[in-house]
């Protein structure tokens, strides 16, 4: 076997080499994606009155593109404007989205504080042993989501994606979210951070 596939350069970063086949992204057979407009392929358009309309266009979303490239089945549980609170408290149950997947990608956080004004809290709001005790904060609800997914598939690989930097005043909060999400990932087996603030 040629081990060159597995070797990383001394200073190589994840986005240094982008493969047309998505590299090892096809290692999973089925992935669930929990996210907001950045995962739902949301488009902005104008109606006949000139008002802005937002429409989720799942067939154009990055999970749909990865599905076509890799052959992996992507179940997209996202919606524009989604927050960790809404996903946990109503959206997933109302739509039957608590389903088995081999892996999950959770990409929330853009709307929670910056749009809806939900308190961020901290990883101290997460009780992994008794998630119903989690505080009603972004981190408390993220902890509940991960706990629920782990009850569905204890060995699921969960990838938590941080919000991306915007070059705005909110970047300080985004860096805080990333640092706390790293701690959240450390609380659970097979749970990994995809830190968009680092690339």
Residue ranges and their predicted role:
Residues 1-58, 67-68, 97-100, 151-154:
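N-terminal secretory targeting modules
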Residues 30, 41-140:
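Conserved SGNH/GDSL esterase-like catalytic core that processes O-acyl groups on lipids
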Residues 34-36, 77-82, 107-110, 161-165, ...:
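Active-site-proximal beta-strand/loop segments in catalytic clefts of secreted hydrolases
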Residues 145-156, 163:
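Catalytic cores of nucleophile-dependent amide-cleaving enzymes
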